[in-house]
């Protein structure tokens, strides 16, 4: 038996419709409390985590280092590790494939739009990135990655046969995810 006690949302909100940089207000969705992790709180607080046993992440990253969804996940992982909460990631395809390219982020440049020394086009799935964070940051998080089926590193989104759901107003198509990985902001 599972009870959904809270929904934690990243920069672009629950449905990916909030513009970049805009505040994401917490509210309720179908009677469940929604907590914004973009704005005043970028990390779940102990009070937010009190009512949960496990945090699940089912979010589509775009494969570019400066897209903030990985940072939001990383901060949630850190706080769940401190609080002794389990963490489950539902893996998803990297829409721009498994190729890594571009410069590595230098330590002095780290920020919310780039926390780790990975290439601009990082080539990882969200599940692989979660494992990378847990291992390299030595979080000791009770992490489970639910694997996906059928994706191969050479595949782009259009090769998956899956419908694309825009992750933000700036990424309405899978092709725009590739363009984002080609620029450095």
What are these regions (language model features)?
Residues 2, 82-86:
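A short helix->loop->beta-strand "cap" motif at the edges of active sites that frequently abuts
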Residues 110-180:
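Conserved anion/nucleotide-ligand pocket segment
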Residues 5-11:
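Short internal beta-strands
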Residues 24-51, 64:
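Glycine-rich oxoanion-binding loops at beta->alpha junctions
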Residues 61-72:
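Glycine/threonine-rich flexible loop motifs
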Residues 12-29:
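N-terminal beta-loop-helix "entrance" segment that forms/cooperates
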Residues 183-185:
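Conserved small/polar residues in nucleotide/adenosyl-binding loops
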Residues 16-20, 88-110:
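Glycine-rich, charge-decorated loop segments at or immediately adjacent to ligand/cofactor-binding or catalytic sites
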